[in-house]
Amino acid sequence: MAAVGFSAGAWVTLSVAETNAFDLFEPQSKLQLRAAAAFYPPCRGAATRPGMPTLIFIGALDDWTPAAECTNRVAIWGNEGPPIELIVYPGAYHGFYYQHLQPGTMLFGHWLEYNGAAVDDATRRLRQFLDRHLN
């Protein structure tokens, strides 16, 4: 099983990936996560390195959860442990996966906009990532 989340849900995904502590959210569960994928997470809040293969997608123009925070966090985490891959999409904003954000819009002072090229690439990469780590 893998955790996949978007924005605030991506923060939950990274939090669960830190310790594989799925029981924080499902106390009676015996489920174990094997991989995590986070779309535009707030990386500054992710203190501990994920303990499982993790894939992070973010837009270079995201002003809500800035790509620089994820780039810095991944650098701090280093290369020890399970693989962590960060994909930064040039020209993409927060919410790039949501087709209804076309044209883009402001929300709480942040620009949100669909980006079809980023979606196509992220979908392909996510499928490959899940195939690698779940099969």
Question: Model segments located where?
Answer:
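Stable alpha-helical elements in mature extracytoplasmic
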Residues: A8, E69-R73, A122, L126
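Sec-exported extracytoplasmic/periplasmic mature domains
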Residues: A17-A21, G78-P82, D131-N135
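Short alpha-helix in the alpha/beta-hydrolase fold that links the catalytic acid
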Residues: M52, P66-W77
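Short beta-strand/loop motif that positions the catalytic acidic residue
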Residues: I56-I58
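Acidic beta-to-alpha connecting loop that harbors the catalytic carboxylate
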Residues: A60-D63, G91-Y93
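C-terminal catalytic histidine-bearing segment of alpha/beta-hydrolase fold enzymes
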Residues: P83-N135
